[in-house]
């Protein structure tokens, strides 16, 4: 049972709520450096976990996890790798969502001078990000983005703001030997 792994913090959510049998949810405010330091974290999410397994099934060679808080670390890593990149968005239950598309656009904005962009979805993501860049939170709020509506209904506006804030976590989770570990650019 994942909820009983000795010495590990077990966490996860299903549909925006702490998953049954786990200790914690996926709010960034549950994981202060002093709380999580030197501990393993076992995390499952409604959409991200599924995307990770999908990437593995498709034979992805190099998997990282990314979000606005680690945007610069992600961009630096992608530029340093100098390989073709596929940005795979976790979405929400097989449906496109605004915040994932905004993040893909932000990555494209940071790496576009180093890569050729040859996909309309990338062009659209970058255009959306360019429009939203002045205030990402207000953009998703004003557009009544589905994730915004769902999470704000739970009182998680602070989490949304945190997750849309670029470069506040200089960490790069890299998938190696069956788990995500801290990587470097």
Residue ranges of each PLM-predicted region?
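Short, acidic/turn-prone active-site loops that include or flank metal/cofactor-
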Residues: 13-18, 48, 67-71
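Long, charged alpha-helical interface segments
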Residues: 23-46, 50, 54-62, 98-185
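Phosphate/ribose-phosphate-bearing ligand recognition and processing surfaces
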Residues: 90-100
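Glycine-rich phosphate/diphosphate-binding loops that line cofactor/substrate pockets in enzymes
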Residues: 77-85
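Short hydrophobic beta-strand segments
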Residues: 10, 84-89
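Internal active-site segments that recognize and position negatively charged phosphoryl groups
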Residues: 50-55, 72-78
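Short, structured patches in soluble enzyme cores that scaffold and shape functional sites
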Residues: 43-47, 65-68, 87-91
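Class I S-adenosyl-L-methionine
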Residues: 1-35
């Amino acid at each position: 049972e994942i909820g009983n792994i000795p010495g590990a913090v077990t966490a996860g959510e299903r549909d925006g709520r702490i998953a049954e049998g786990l200790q914690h949810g996926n709010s960034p405010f549950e994981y202060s450096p002093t709380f999580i330091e030197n501990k393993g974290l076992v995390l499952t999410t409604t959409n991200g976990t599924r995307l990770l397994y999908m990437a593995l099934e498709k034979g992805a060679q190099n998997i990282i996890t990314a979000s606005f808080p680690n945007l610069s670390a992600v961009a630096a890593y992608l530029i340093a790798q100098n390989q073709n990149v596929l940005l795979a968005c976790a979405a929400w239950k097989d449906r496109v969502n605004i915040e994932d598309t905004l993040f893909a656009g932000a990555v494209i904005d940071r790496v576009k001078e180093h890569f050729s962009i040859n996909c309309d979805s990338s062009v659209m993501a970058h255009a959306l990000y360019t429009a939203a860049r002045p205030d990402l939170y207000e953009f998703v709020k004003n557009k009544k983005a589905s994730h915004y509506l769902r999470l704000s209904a739970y009182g998680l506006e602070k989490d949304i703001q945190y997750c849309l804030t670029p470069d506040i976590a200089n960490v790069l989770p890299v998938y190696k030997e069956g788990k995500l570990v801290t990587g470097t650019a």
